Regions:
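Ligand-site clamp/hinge motif
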Residues: 51, 79-125, 243, 252-254
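Append "and occasionally in soluble cytosolic enzymes with long acidic Gly/Pro-rich linkers
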Residues: 77-80, 129, 155-244, 248, ...
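Short, well-ordered beta-strand elements
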Residues: 22-24, 61-64, 74-75, 90-95, ...
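Ligand/substrate-recognition segments at binding pockets and active sites
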Residues: 70, 182, 194, 211, ...
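Surface-exposed binding/hinge segments that line
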Residues: 3-45
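Solvent-exposed coil/turn segments that connect beta secondary-structure elements
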Residues: 19-20, 27-31, 68-70, 79-81, ...
Length: 373
């Protein structure tokens, strides 16, 4: 099942016009349609390939699937029938390396040629000083947030969520967990987007205000909650820093370090958590706040109505105004603790050309990648 099938629910018909053109009909105007069609979830697949697509995907891209060793690697080879420009690479292997120490060792030994989203930012200066490597620093679409269960007492009280927001020192988290890599955010929107509103002052670091808000909420003695952390270093390192900052205003957190499967089961699907830290890397995903059954369980009819109106609006100026209003609503409701936009750091062999500096979508595009002569 396509995880983003709701994005395409408005399609009523797809008609073949000629060998290279199709006509897509919608049940109503959709201002996000073209953007949605650029998602990886909108790729074309042959119906007869569906049964085995989980283990042997078939597509129309520049490379074809060759082999998958679960937990270790995926092997691709150049597609001789690719419709676009012929890629320079004949083959490519994607390795799975999640541990920061192992990542550093693999790159330093040149066992891998490119490591996108490098998980150990503290090692980047060492690579920058080594002529064998190049370091690219860009941006992702990843809003890194202190996700909050809006239905769990006392987190269902906006004063408590506001107290948490003012107890957090974003820059200390960026410096301590990400070694300075990351851009502070005050809402769920990418700072490089033209429609971004800087709302960081709405939740500035103010522990005394945090204590005052807790007292107003009847929690002058503080309270305890859970902080369940997925594997990425931004979460594990950031979690320790945030726990210390919350403790300073009287909020105690019980930290649990989870593997991704556990996090998906307990937090994302089970909603059995108080706080968690995660980067939402899907582009332009502020619409998730209009889904009351989403894992942070935010239910605001005004916001839901705004998103419905946005989806049916195609005028760019009107859409911009709506997106800015949406950012302000969730910032003022302190739905989550908005931390930073995740940086996109890549370490690569100095001879590799054509790599993406930024990560505008969840893809690693190899069509333009080549080796220098």
């Amino acid at each position: 099942t396509n995880a983003q099938k709701a994005l395409f629910s408005g399609i009523t018909d797809v008609a073949v016009v000629n060998d290279t053109t199709v006509k897509v009909s919608l049940d109503k105007p959709n201002g996000s349609f073209l953007f949605n069609m650029a998602w990886g979830d909108a790729v074309i697949v042959a119906p007869e390939s569906i049964e085995g697509i989980k283990n042997k995907p078939v597509g129309t891209g520049a490379f074809t699937f060759q082999n998958w060793v679960q937990g270790d690697r995926i092997e691709l080879s150049r597609n001789p029938d690719y419709w676009g420009n012929r890629p320079a690479l004949e083959k490519a292997t994607f390795k799975f390396i999640s541990d920061p120490t192992a990542a550093f060792a693999a790159v330093m030994a040149q066992d891998v040629d490119v490591f996108t989203g490098f998980p150990a930012p503290e090692n980047l200066p060492q690579f920058e000083a080594d002529p064998r490597f190049q370091v690219l620093e860009g941006s992702t679409e990843g809003e890194t947030i202190l996700s909050t269960n809006n239905k769990m007492p006392p987190l269902d009280n906006v004063k408590v969520r506001k107290a948490i927001a003012h107890a957090i020192d974003r820059q200390a988290i960026i410096d301590g967990a990400m070694f300075g890599y990351g851009t502070p955010i005050g809402t769920h929107f990418a700072p490089h987007n033209p429609d971004y509103v800087d709302l960081t002052s709405n939740s500035n670091y103010d522990p005394e205000l945090s204590k005052k808000l807790l007292a107003e909420a009847g929690l002058s003695g503080g309270f305890k909650t859970t902080l369940k952390l997925p594997p990425p270093s931004y979460a594990r390192r950031g979690g320790e820093i945030i726990a210390s900052q919350l403790r300073a205003v009287g909020i105690e957190t019980e930290i649990s370090n989870l593997e991704w499967a556990q996090w998906l089961e307990q937090v994302f699907r089970g909603k059995d958590y108080g706080l968690t830290i995660v980067s939402h890397t899907e582009p332009m995903d502020i619409g998730i706040y209009a889904r009351p059954d989403y894992y942070f369980q935010y239910d605001n009819p005004e916001f839901q109505s705004l998103m419905t109106e946005l989806n049916g609006t195609t005028d760019p100026a009107k859409r911009s105004s709506m997106l800015k209003k949406a950012q302000r609503i969730i910032s003022n409701d302190y739905v989550n603790g908005y931390l930073f936009e995740l940086a996109f750091t890549t370490v690569a062999n100095a001879k590799v050309r054509g790599l993406w500096k930024n990560a505008p979508t969840q893809a690693t595009d190899l069509t333009g990648v080549s080796w220098a002569d």
